[in-house]
UniProtKB/Swiss-Prot annotation:
Keywords: ATP-binding, Chaperone, Coiled coil, Cytoplasm, Nucleotide-binding, Repeat, Stress response. Residues 163-344 are annotated as: NBD1. PROSITE patterns: CLP_R, CLPAB_1, CLPAB_2. GO terms for biological process: cellular response to heat; protein refolding. Residues 773-865 are annotated as: C-terminal. One of its GO terms (molecular function) is ATP binding. Its main location: cytoplasm. Residues 561-772 are annotated as: NBD2. Residues 395-529 form a coiled coil. The gene is clpB. One of its GO terms (cellular component) is cytoplasm. This is Chaperone protein ClpB.
Length: 865
């Protein structure tokens, strides 16, 4: 027996024979061991053929195992050291197999030759197993021809090339017949263009090019559905569309040339079909370079000749970037394909697509999807989710909203969960009290037993209600699944012209199921507001998902948020004292945006805050972030003093290709991409280079900016605040007046125009001038600073009282109109905080003490009460 003439699978089977013999304690390898080895091979040819014959491979295995168990076993110490020998019959199988191989005109002995040899030689155990499972040689040869076709075994691994299309692809037309594909709505123009190209004599290979998620694969599925319905020209009727899986084609190809063998086998099957099979390669750019090793051809070069001759009907799908990067580089491959550009559908088209898919999602999740949820998904995803494309992002929204509602149905309602926890807690308390004998414990035990009895009754009633509602929802899901299956059967019956069956299902089963579904839905509606479970996906759920994805609040305003927005000005003024005009402008911009009345193409607001140092410009931005987001973390702060050089603009949007930091992205663009709903503070803008401001023009006008990788960053949900000290000397001369007078405003504006270009200033929503703080306002700021000290000391359980005289001294000693409120803060830190800290460290004061801050002769004194 020449081992080189055996295929890899036969060599593997011989090795497996020895393992099987050792496992069953047999001293010799016989034909039954070989039979067991070849029917146990994973993805093997013999199990595949037996399956095609209708035999149960697992039953055959069990019968073979029983036969192996009956064979004589050799046990003991001597048996372990003894060698395992092959019987004469075992050798005869390969001699016979070689003859069968020659009859088949094959170059190697393959597993099918071995199987046929086993059928001829073993008339005992193997014959009885085959007879028992109705496996005859004649039927085996018939199934073998189906799988093998006219192929010869001319390689050591022929099994990888048998039935190649079914192994490495998926029949989309078959899936469409089985009602497995999602319905394709619209896209008629694109499908017609694909049909037109497929109908050509040569170069009949369309390639669908479009952004990810616009529905390229769906168009091919739509074509498969049209072929099933017969809604195609005569030349495409009864064609098969096979979706080729490049991953499984490459996977497991260990040896050189194995990948090419598999691909050639696929192409041979397509060629033999004489145009009946259309190959669909999703992500077609993967064929360029696939299987490429030193001196070998890649998949792209293997299919080129067939594409040019028109022997291979192929549909490709890829994105613009990948097409440019891989296909366009290879001009010979590019000219063999005809481009079909797939554009993103409009919002209205996306709504139609979602309406078509609605029923599938309802069946999958077992929920009811309202039409307003579908409209909201299309509109909100288009407006707020950037960087992705319709209809994919809208479908994802509906899918996740459905999953969220389903999860709530499957989880125990909060009310019932809390009740069960309370019962559990009281049961533990009851057990503990039952061991006590005092009067109080007995009284408490009686009270608990009574309360526990009531709670258990309530739990019983609520659990029954929950189970009933859940069963109703599950019942609807099952009925809808059944209805969908029946509709698939109707389509099949109509295709096969079985009109009696179609009519029976259409006018008998369908109305009956629809009536049952309606009855169950009415039962759920009767629960109304008292229902424990909600099985509806509404606009609210979709809005919540958008908010979770983007961080932008798009859900309907709840009462708490309404009050918060209406009190926004007051909340801001608690921290930013004396700047009413600035606070009002910012608050109004936020309210307009939240009500949905802002300009959709611009940021929520873009402001320049002008004024002397220490009057609250930066503080207003921080306070706005704190009030709106409950944290200052959502403020994106960029200190413009770091952008004094012309080239430093690249730090905002990212370095150009080839420069250090290209992969890291820009400080501004990356921050906004992660948190699109935020306050962006550009501090001290007059310090930056004038060219840096050119990138702001697009942000202010269109609410967008393109980063170094070509990604569009959306600023439409940001508040942009810039602070500057330009013209502060003019504003300082305005002190004591409640508002900035017109003359001062003109002087400041003239200075501002001298520093910034008109196109920059013209795009701003508002230029707000902060006036210097008056003595009255200083008093309020002192209160804010002192309140901070009180809150710090409260943690240490120390209280402080501050006399009015002390506040006057702080104002006189700490306030400087030129420097604003910052010197006040420093004065309070140096005099009050430092003094209290020293008293605490030295042990003069301890927890529970009350301190009194008094003032006299321009000095502060701190005494313990």
């Amino acid at each position: 027996m020449d081992v080189d003439k055996l295929t890899l699978k036969v060599q593997q089977a011989i090795n497996d024979c020895q393992t099987i013999a050792v496992r069953y304690n047999h001293q010799q390898i016989d034909t039954i061991h070989l039979f067991m080895a070849i029917i146990s091979q994973e993805d093997g040819l013999i199990p595949n053929i037996l399956g095609k014959m209708g035999a149960d491979v697992e039953t055959v295995k069990r019968d073979t195992e029983a036969e192996l168990d009956r064979m004589p076993k050799v046990l003991g110490e001597g048996a372990q050291n003894a060698s395992i020998y092959a019987t004469r019959r075992f050798e005869e199988v390969f001699v016979r197999g070689e003859k069968i191989s020659r009859d088949f005109k094959d170059l190697y002995i393959s597993v099918e030759h071995v199987m046929l040899a086993l059928m001829d030689i073993d008339s005992g155990a193997i014959k009885s197993i085959l007879d028992k499972n109705n496996i005859s040689k004649k039927e085996f040869l018939k199934a073998l021809r189906e799988v093998r076709g006219n192929q010869r075994v001319d390689t050591s691994d022929p099994e990888g090339t048998y039935d190649a299309l079914n192994k490495y692809g998926r029949d989309l037309v078959k899936d469409a017949k089985k009602h497995k594909l999602d319905p394709v709505i619209g896209r008629d123009e694109e499908i017609r263009r694909v049909i037109r190209i497929l109908s050509r004599r040569t170069k009949n290979n369309p390639v669908l090019i479009g952004e990810p998620g616009v529905g390229k694969t769906a168009i091919v599925e739509g074509l498969a559905e049209r072929i099933v319905r017969g809604d195609v020209p005569e030349g495409l009727k009864n064609k098969i569309i096979f979706s080729l899986d490049m991953g499984s084609l490459v996977a497991g190809a260990k040896y050189r040339g194995e990948f090419e063998e598999r691909l050639k086998a696929v192409l041979k099957e397509v060629e033999r079909s004489e145009g009946k099979i259309i190959l669909f390669i999703d992500e077609i750019h993967t064929i360029v370079g696939a299987g490429k090793t030193e001196g070998a051809m890649d998949a792209g070069n293997i299919i080129k000749p067939m594409l040019a001759r028109g022997e291979l009907h192929c549909i490709g799908a890829t994105t613009f970037d990948e097409y440019r990067k891989y296909i366009e580089k290879d001009k010979a491959l590019e000219r063999r394909f005809q481009k079909v550009q797939i554009d993103e559908p409009t919002v209205d088209d996306a709504i139609s697509i979602l309406r078509g898919l609605k029923e599938r999602f309802e069946i999958h999740h077992g929920v009811r999807i309202h039409d307003n949820a579908i409209v909201a998904a299309a509109k909100l995803s288009d407006r707020y989710i950037t960087g992705r494309f319709l209809p994919d992002k809208a479908i994802d929204l509906i899918d996740e909203a459905g999953a969220m509602v389903r999860m709530e149905i499957d989880s125990m309602p909060t009310e019932l969960d809390m009740l069960k926890r309370k019962i559990f807690q009281m049961e533990i308390e009851k057990e503990a009290l039952s061991k006590e004998s005092d009067k109080f414990s007995r009284e408490r035990l009686e009270s608990i037993q009574k309360e526990l009895s009531d709670l258990k009754d309530k739990d019983k009633a609520m659990t029954a209600k929950y189970d009933k509602e859940k069963a109703q929802i599950q019942g609807i899901k099952e009925l809808k699944t059944k209805l969908d299956e029946i509709r698939g059967q109707i389509e099949k019956a109509e295709r096969e012209y079985d009109l009696n069956k179609a009519a029976e299902l259409k006018y008998g089963e369908v109305p009956k199921l629809e009536h049952e579904i309606e009855e169950k839905e009415n039962l759920i509606k009767q629960n109304g507001q008292n229902a424990m479970l909600k099985e509806e996906v509404t606009e609210e759920q979709v809005s919540n998902i958008v908010s979770k994805w983007t961080g932008i609040p798009v859900s309907k305003l709840v009462e708490g948020e309404r009050n918060k927005l209406m009190r926004l000005s007051d909340e801001l003024e608690k921290r930013v004292v004396g700047q009413t005009e600035a606070v009002k402008s910012v608050a109004d911009a936020v309210i307009r945006a939240r009500a949905g009345l802002k300009d959709m193409s611009k940021p929520i607001g873009s402001f320049i805050f002008l004024g002397p140092t220490g009057v609250g410009k930066t503080e207003l931005a921080k306070t706005l972030a704190r009030v709106m987001f409950d944290s200052e973390d959502n403020i994106i702060r960029i200190d413009m003093s770091e952008y004094m050089e012309k080239y430093s603009v690249s730090r905002l949007i990212g370095s150009p290709p080839g420069y250090v930091g290209y992969e890291e992205g820009g400080q501004l663009t990356e921050a906004v991409r992660r948190k699109p709903y935020s306050v962006i503070l550009f501090d001290e803008i007059e310090k930056a280079h004038s060219d840096v401001f050119n990138i702001f023009l697009q942000i202010f006008d269109d609410g967008r900016l393109t980063d170094n990788k070509g990604n569009t960053i959306d600023f439409k949900n940001s508040i942009i605040i810039m602070t500057s000290n330009i013209g502060s000397e003019h504003l300082l001369n305005n002190k004591g007046v409640s508002n900035v007078d017109e003359e001062t405003k003109d002087k400041v504006m003239n200075e501002l125009k001298g520093r910034f270009k008109p196109e920059f200033l013209n795009r701003l929503d508002d230029i707000i001038m902060f006036k210097p703080l008056s003595i009255n306002e200083i008093g309020k700021i002192i209160d804010i600073f002192l309140e901070n000290i009180k809150s710090k000391l409260k943690e240490k359980n120390i209280k402080i009282d501050i006399a009015e005289e002390a506040k006057k001294i702080i104002a006189e000693e700490g306030y400087d109109p030129v420097y604003g409120a910052r010197p006040l803060k420093r004065y309070i830190e140096n005099t009050i905080e430092t003094h209290i800290a020293k008293m605490f460290i030295s042990g003069e004061i301890s927890e529970g003490d009350i301190l009194k801050i008094e003032g006299s002769d321009s000095k502060l004194t701190i005494v313990k009460k």
